[in-house]
């Protein structure tokens, strides 16, 4: 076989690059899904703290991976999960929360009155502006695909 899986990593013959195995990524996503269930009722900062312990440990183990694109995708996916969680938590105050965070009246109105669900709305420009990646970094959310010092 071209790819070998060992201890959560996949090593390919071509170029011999180490990447995180698909099964390990799916297990991480399952853990994140558990922590970011929209019905938990915890504050966003508490969810980020819980995620921090999981992601820091995962990053420590899988930090030697050379293929970073799947890790970048996980980073984006985690931020989207958190935006979805926050939107669901805001409920009917969504418009007010968006306006408070600098979203224009029109964008906030269109987003808050949308018929789409929280997951779909979590990728809208309004929520990305209200809850940017920088905010999650300030809360302490680690990035898996962060460049390593050589």
Spans of features found by a protein language model:
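Non-catalytic terminal/accessory segments
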Residues: 1-150
């Amino acid at each position: 076989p071209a790819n070998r899986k060992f201890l959560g990593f996949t090593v390919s013959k071509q170029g011999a690059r180490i990447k995180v195995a698909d099964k390990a990524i799916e297990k991480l996503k399952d853990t994140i899904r558990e922590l970011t269930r929209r019905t938990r009722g915890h504050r966003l900062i508490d969810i980020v703290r819980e995620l921090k312990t999981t992601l820091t440990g995962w990053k420590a183990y899988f930090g030697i991976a050379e293929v970073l694109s799947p890790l970048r995708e996980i980073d984006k996916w985690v931020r989207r999960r958190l935006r979805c969680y926050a939107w669901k938590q805001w409920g009917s105050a969504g418009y007010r929360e968006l306006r408070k965070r600098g979203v224009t009246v029109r964008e906030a109105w269109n987003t808050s009155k949308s018929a789409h669900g929280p997951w779909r709305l979590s990728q809208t420009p309004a929520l990305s502006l209200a809850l940017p990646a920088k905010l999650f970094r300030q809360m302490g959310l680690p990035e898996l695909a962060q460049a390593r010092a050589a």
